[in-house]
A protein has these predicted regions:
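Short, charged/polar N-terminal "headpieces" of proteins
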Residues: 1-17
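Active-site- and interface-proximal helix/loop "cap" or "latch" segments in soluble metabolic
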Residues: 12-14, 19-92, 293
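A structural signal for small-residue-enriched, beta-sheet-centric alpha/beta enzyme cores
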Residues: 14, 28-30, 229, 238-305, ...
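Flexible, glycine/charged-enriched surface loops at secondary-structure junctions
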Residues: 55-61, 72-79, 133, 221-228, ...
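N-terminal lobe of the biotin/lipoate ligase/transferase fold
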Residues: 87-200
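Contiguous, small/hydrophobic- and glycine-enriched helical/loop subdomains that border
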Residues: 185-232
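Beta-rich nucleic-acid/ligand-interaction surfaces
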Residues: 226-245, 327-336
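Conserved small/polar residues in nucleotide/adenosyl-binding loops
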Residues: 350-352
């Protein structure tokens, strides 16, 4: 049995193992990481011998941690990474190569439909009616999408919403409010089995799932880095943010919105920027906290979208997929029963 895990921003760890009487046997740990002293690897391997094959990645990481001595140095690898590689070797955790993906662009829909599809399409994937996928959003009107647990009145300036005809939606994931005008943002949703991030903390899962898009940004000459917990940023400010929701059905949505351009005046008239966030970010201006991609590249939004689409398709051998009329009808129905309802948008307890 063979499993691999590449630590985001780190090194590759490889585990080979057999299982005898439901326990690990003949475990081998290797990779391009660095350990000091050399015998730390022997101790790590020995700690895994005889471990129950049903052990979680967390339990396996604890075994590795216990085998380390004070002063041991691990570079490019963590005990958690070893645990994930073991789980992958046992077939309990998935890698990207284990998943047959679709890649989808669009269609252009009313703002709230995209938010609803981040729930309805997860249900389709879990039921086997659709493959896991990466979907690039398109929408036909200005919107603000607030996080699942945010207060409408604390995040939204109603006068600005009314003035500019903005749709306010509440998504199924947590995180902060996003001001999203057509043509000024790039948003994608990734629907995957939670087994792809089995054993990872949220802090580990975010950069792991967005590693492919960081590669695209680098190719496009956009200097970006991941800032824990869930921000993509340049040295000048935030480019985008990610959010996730994991369902009990074994699937999850991970989505990211990145600023391509920004109407700073309009954003400040629509969103409220709380004093706690101002103090935390160290600036009095929401605008100064955002660094849209257009500031670093002269490429049109459409070219960046195509680069995302092509890179994901090539990297993960994805098939081009579509959103059907039936998918849209299901999403519209979900808007009527949930996402467009006042009690959802204005934070009723029905969704918690």
């Amino acid at each position: 049995m063979h499993g691999e895990y590449k630590v985001p921003g780190g090194k590759l760890v490889v585990v080979d193992t057999d299982v005898e009487e439901d326990r690990l046997a003949r475990v081998s740990v290797s990779g391009d990481f660095f350990l000091d002293p050399d015998d730390a690897l022997t101790r790590i391997t020995a700690s895994l011998e005889g471990a129950p094959a049903s052990s979680s990645a967390k339990d396996l990481a604890a075994r590795v941690e216990a085998a380390l001595h004070e002063g041991d140095t691990l570079m490019g690898v963590t005990p958690e990474a070893v645990g994930i590689a073991v789980r992958r070797a046992l077939g309990a955790a998935l890698s990207w190569d284990d998943i047959d993906f679709d890649v989808i662009h669009g269609p252009v829909v009313d703002p709230m439909i995209n938010v609803a599809m981040d729930e309805t399409l997860v249900e389709d994937v879990a039921a086997g009616r659709r493959k896991p996928f990466m979907r690039l959003w398109e929408w036909n009107g200005p919107q603000v999408v607030i996080g699942s647990f945010q207060s409408y009145q604390n995040e939204i300036q109603q006068d600005g919403v009314d003035r500019y005809g903005i749709t306010v939606s509440r998504r199924v994931t947590g995180g902060g409010a996003m001001f999203m005008e057509p043509g000024n943002c790039i948003t994608y949703s990734l629907v995957i089995p939670t087994a792809l991030v089995e054993g990872m903390s949220f802090e580990q899962a975010y950069p792991y799932l967005d590693q492919w898009v960081m590669e695209v940004l680098e190719k496009l000459g956009i200097k970006a880095k991941y800032v824990p917990l869930n921000d993509i940023a340049s040295e000048f400010g935030k480019i985008g943010g990610a959010a996730q929701k994991r369902w009990a059905n074994g699937y999850m949505v991970h989505h990211v919105t990145m600023a391509y351009d920004i109407d700073a005046i309009k954003m400040n008239e629509v969103l409220r920027i709380g004093m706690e966030k101002i103090r935390d970010k160290g600036t009095r201006s929401a605008v100064k906290r955002v660094d849209p991609m257009r500031s670093q590249t002269g490429l049109p939004r459409e070219e960046i979208l195509q680069a995302f689409f092509d890179h994901f398709k090539e990297k993960y051998n994805a098939t081009v997929g579509t959103i059907t009329d039936e998918d849209l009808e299901v999403a519209r129905a979900r808007c009527e029963t949930k996402f467009a309802r006042e009690e959802w948008v204005h934070l009723s307890l029905i969704h918690i």
